[in-house]
Amino acid sequence: VANGAVPCSKVTGKWLFPRAALDRWIEAGMAKPHGFVAHDAPPIVGGSHDPLLEWALRRSGSGLALLSVGSEAGLAKLAANEVAIAAIHMHALDNDDANLTAVAAAQHLHDAVVIAFARREEGLLVAPGNPLALSSLTDATKAKARFAARQSGAGAQLLLAKLMAADSSSIERLNLLPSTFMTGDDLAFAIRADEADCGIATRAAANAHGLDFVSLAWEHFDLAMRRRTYFEPGVQALLALMRSPEFHRHAELLGGFDTGAAGTVRLTR
């Protein structure tokens, strides 16, 4: 009102707000509280790649595309309204639920909800037979194993940093390959091609590529979205599948998933 942005007039000391003009002003998106987004995000799930999620998006007929850019980038795109959903598995030292912490702290996400997708088993992918006899990250460091790393901000890379810090070590002590890999599948291909000795990804990725697996941790893999997105038909189709026996059977087939809490609300803002 003070700067003239709101359509109104002052008559005999009283402010008058013309209904039609005010409605047009609101519809134009000029009245937005901090973090409010006036337009719908594109039907994209951005963030971490996951084979169970990829299958579920197709099988449910959700109409949602998958953009694999890593957990941190996915959450940033959600906040910027560039994706409808962020698929995330965050990690931080001394924080066993970094997903919820990250969403709660995110700017421009005052209306967020976090839905459990699955718990996943993460660990070291190694060549068949585990030729270097690796059983830990310490072994990988000592053996100077060629370590395939993920891009900065990827959940697997955050987990690697957390595990190394918990062991009073750092990623820099590993024999890292010069290039990084965008997905667990890319990392697995590098190991199959003998371009790398090991790297962190899911048990499902190891199973899919015929690799051996050294378990290191279980993690929450969640879907973050705005509350209004939750009620979209495509999202409801996905959630319906996540609650079905077929979803749980497919998770068992892939391996390394716990889908007992799939579809439950873990956080609302």
Predicted segments, located by residue:
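Short helices/loops that flank or line small-molecule/ion binding pockets
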Residues: 72-86, 91, 180-195
